[in-house]
Curated annotation (Swiss-Prot):
The gene is MRPL55. This is Large ribosomal subunit protein mL55. It comes from the Eukaryota. Belongs to the mitochondrion-specific ribosomal protein mL55 family. Residues 1-33 form a transit peptide. GO terms for cellular component: mitochondrial inner membrane; mitochondrial large ribosomal subunit; mitochondrion. It comes from Homo sapiens (Human). It is found in: Mitochondrion. PANTHER family: 39S RIBOSOMAL PROTEIN L55, MITOCHONDRIAL, LARGE RIBOSOMAL SUBUNIT PROTEIN ML55.
Amino acid sequence: MAAVGSLLGRLRQSTVKATGPALRRLHTSSWRADSSRASLTRVHRQAYARLYPVLLVKQDGSTIHIRYREPRRMLAMPIDLDTLSPEERRARLRKREAQLQSRKEYEQELSDDLHVERYRQFWTRTKK
């Protein structure tokens, strides 16, 4: 009886070994594409989808590709005025003051020429 039991055990082992590779071939997905894959690798999607590739120009002229929230081609970092020579600093300040003065002139050109009586008919109720 013991001999029959051991014979059946060996028969089972040989059939399992023989059908093992065939069973593996039937399974079409790879062993890496199971449910644990997400915990082993990074998520292949951006955290913030609305970021655009932009070229960032630093103060020294070097460039870096970054992702920015607005679709632009290039961003330039502002120049530190403390690192400039006094002549360059004065020239930049003069240029900035000229731009500010032109903006003030433009704001002064806007005047209020609205005639209220001309539009009074639109907000008064008429009797029906």
